[in-house]
Amino acid sequence: MLGGLKDKLTGKNGNKIKGLAVLMSRKLLDPRDFTASLLDNVHEVFGNSITCQLVSATVADQNNEGRGIVGSEANLEQGLTDLPSVSQGESKLTVRFNWEMDKHGVPGAIIIKNHHSTKFFLKTITLHDVPGCDTIVFVANSWIYPVGKYHYNRIFFANNSYLPSQMPEALRPYREDELRYLRGEDRQGPYQEHDRIYRYDVYNDLGEPDRDNPRPVLGGSQKHPYPRRGRTGRIPTKKDPNSESRLSLLEQIYVPSDERFAHLKMSDFAGYSIKAIVQGILPAIRTYVDLTPGEFDSFEDILKLYRGGLKLPSIPALEELRKSFPVQLIKDLLPVGGSYLLKFPKPDIIKENEVAWRTDEEFAREILAGLNPMVIRRLTEFPPKSTLDPSKYGDQTSTITPAHIEKNLEGLSVQQALDSNRLYILDHHDHFMPFLIDINSLDGIFTYATRTLLFLRDDDTLKPLAIELSLPHIEGNLTSAKSKVHTPASSGIESWVWQLAKAYVAVNDSGWHQLISHWLNTHAVMEPFVIATNRQLSVTHPVYKLLQPHYRDTMTINALARQTLINGGGIFEQTVFPGKHALAMSSAVYKNWNFTEQGLPDDLIKRGIAIKDPSSPSKVKLLIKDYPYATDGLAIWQAIEQWVTEYCAIYYPNDGVLQGDVELQAWWKEVREVGHGDLKDADWWPKMQSLPELTKACTTIIWIASALHAAVNFGQYPYAGYLPNRPTISRRPMPEPGSKEYTELDENPEKFFIRTITSQFQTILGVSLIEILSKHSADEIYLGQRDTPEWTSDPKALEAFKRFSRQLVEIESKVLNMNKDPLLKNRVGPANFPYTLMFPNTSDNKGAAEGITARGIPNSISI
């Protein structure tokens, strides 16, 4: 600091370059670290403890293998004058470099060394008044650990974008070194908190063989193919060397250090919250259930969860948990005081009308505008056929006949309804039939494989026609189906039989939603892209800059899921009907996963909901015009596609440049052959030899990470927080006329219905979880936003991104206007709950949509 003052007084500043570093508060970022407050007094602590060295992009050091010349060390320090105002939780430090432009050239990278005893989070370093360059920005967004933790220098490049062939020669070795460090091929693990290694592994850490609770290894075999997850390098279990040992709940599972949220993200809150549920609230719920009859008896009993709450018994574990968790994170999390009142906010589905969920209209509307609107397909043949192998399952053709449905076809015959695109099906029959014998052998589980036929009315709403409930029936070597068809009824016991039939459908749909639409098709399939991008694409690569925001926190939330949610005996197995067979079932589904069908237009065409239409902006035409998920989603898809197309065209003027991009080709090869290696021989993989292939792939990746995940995640509590609307488990069969159970249904239909679906314990546990998982954080970064305005120096890219953001804001207005249109009946429905899950929320720059809002498309899968 005194040296800087001397230079000012003597005028010796000709070779000085001023810089400004932005650091994040440790106290804000890591509430568990009680030394963090000491670090936040940056003026007292830092002094000479953080040093910086500029690296030339234009002048090579021939004594250092032609690498860019490295300048002398400069210290971060508090400035003499008042610094510009900073955002909450940020600290700004100045730095002054001795750098002769005519001798050292243009700075293109910066080396940071942390000589302090603990880590800090560096956001950016900006050089001001650089001769010939004006401003140079180094974007870090990285945890910097003490220098002894690394066997290499931490280096950050200026925010320019370079294809590998365009990288300044003096910086090329640094670029290659950095990728080699991230690949960590020479490091087997177990990896530590400070490590930055991205490697692959199979899902071999879900079970605990040493405690007689094994689960099959998913990935790496024909029997159980699966996407890869991030490697932790933990030691194998004693009983099964192919399974990885697990950590205790409170231990932090490894993810590369910069994948751990450097912000008070909702995924951080989720980590504490889920552990609070498992360690504190879950035992309290068990005790409560043991001390009471253990069941809800009426819908009114369930509604008490949202009115007065439940008084849980005093559990010592809750007090111990309260002491161990950061105060900021538990204010609204753990029940407080001697009464331990557990109360939930009222879900949107029952806010305006507590019984609308029971109607056929709302049941059908949610198939188009609910939690799982990506399963319905157009029926093209009648009766519906099965795709199951007839040599194993016999003839599984539906038993629904024209007599079951023609009275509700508004004067049409079945063939006429088919020909006019008026028949649709929610078909879970083939999804679950192969697994029902195992599933129904679990304690407390009895469910069906369901088919639901629907008719498209003139006003574009759907009308349920029939529900087929099927069970496996073993005949010799065949597992055929034993089925019964139920049709709508509006009064008497028949209406409650119909209500139960819809509940069995909802159970199927809930399981498929959580297991496939949500976990497999967003969380699991995205992780290989995250790993491959960090291993093969430099941070200076334009495709890295395009995709990186859509990976934020994904590895972290997936690691948390493996630790507490999808593991053997975890919350998922306890609350969703496939139980311990759930993940193995998702592996069977993954066998038929196809990356090229994950984009919305291709998905809609595959399901017969849309046809190709070159004249349409989205190139498809919907056959159900009022299909909120698809209507909004196509607008989002088109905006993403236009943005990606404009962006990629800046860097790839022709296919030859793309084909010669060694990093891009290595990235795509690794995605296919390693990350999704169990499907590497599929013929649908794009060859990545043309610009359209790249733009389609990147558009699909961004779609999955943002809009698709938002559609299946942030409506969980609003739609399913009231379990009768979306039960996750069924526990007994449909009662047969003349049976004791049929009499029970007739005498007390509410009680029978509630005792058939998810139990009291499972309900409270499940609702506790999805309340957490449905929340947005105050610092959520939505589609069309970036966490760092200086993410690139390229003005063409910045202008294209502004156009993208403006287009998303325009979509917001269109969504709100459609929700006000009384002719679009599927937008709001009988429950008076508008569909906003595909509302981008790009216009929200202040975190106004914090909490459970049922709107907003975050950039990434972070919860």
Curated annotation (Swiss-Prot):
Q: Which family does it belong to?
A: Belongs to the lipoxygenase family.
Keyword Nucleotide-binding attributed: no
Q: Which InterPro entries match?
A: LipOase, LipOase_C, LipOase_C_sf, LipOase_CS, LipOase_Fe_BS, LipOase_plant, Lipoxygenase_dom_3, PLAT/LH2_dom
Answer yes or no on keyword Glycoprotein: no
**Subunit annotation:** Monomer.
* Taxonomic lineage: Eukaryota, Viridiplantae, Streptophyta, Embryophyta, Tracheophyta
Q: What is this protein called?
A: Linoleate 9S-lipoxygenase 1
Which GO annotations describe the biological process of this protein? fatty acid biosynthetic process; lipid oxidation; oxylipin biosynthetic process
What is the protein's species of origin?
Oryza sativa subsp. japonica (Rice)
Segments for region (Disordered): 204-244
